[in-house]
Amino acid sequence: MRETIQAHKGKTQIEMITGGAIWLTNVIVFALWYWEVDRGGPAARANARKTHPDFLFAQMSSPELVDKDWEPTFVDYLFLSFTNATAFSPTDVLPLTRWAKLTMMLQSAVSLSTVALVIARAVNILR
């Protein structure tokens, strides 16, 4: 009996680590998408080719609190992706365009599904 429980523990740990890796990949991939597509990508943002942003960062709402030439970097999009995947909703960055809203909705659905499937699988292994 003890060997069976130990075998299940090992399987469960592997499942949880794999699920965590999948979830982290989800966060990184969506961060890259947000970074690459917002206002035409990093090069277009640097050259101010597109005036209307797809995302409203808190720094844009309070320009007196940041440098006058502040632009979002990859870390800002990574934070957006992480908070969207954990809270399943916008936190301090608001989507302004339809594609941004749909992409954030897709990320939340993928994240929720991943977490639900990993938990369901772990519970099933323990039975």
Label each region the model flagged.
Residues 1-39:
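Long, highly hydrophobic alpha-helical transmembrane signal-anchor segments
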Residues 2, 15, 60, 84-88, ...:
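Generic, low-specificity signal for short hydrophobic/alpha-helical stretches with a mild N-terminal bias
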Residues 6-12, 69-71, 93-96:
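Helix-boundary and loop/linker segments of multi-pass membrane transporters
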Residues 18, 22, 26, 67, ...:
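Generic alpha-helical structural element
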Residues 36-93:
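Membrane-proximal soluble regions of multi-pass membrane proteins
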Residues 72-127:
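Pore domain of cation channels
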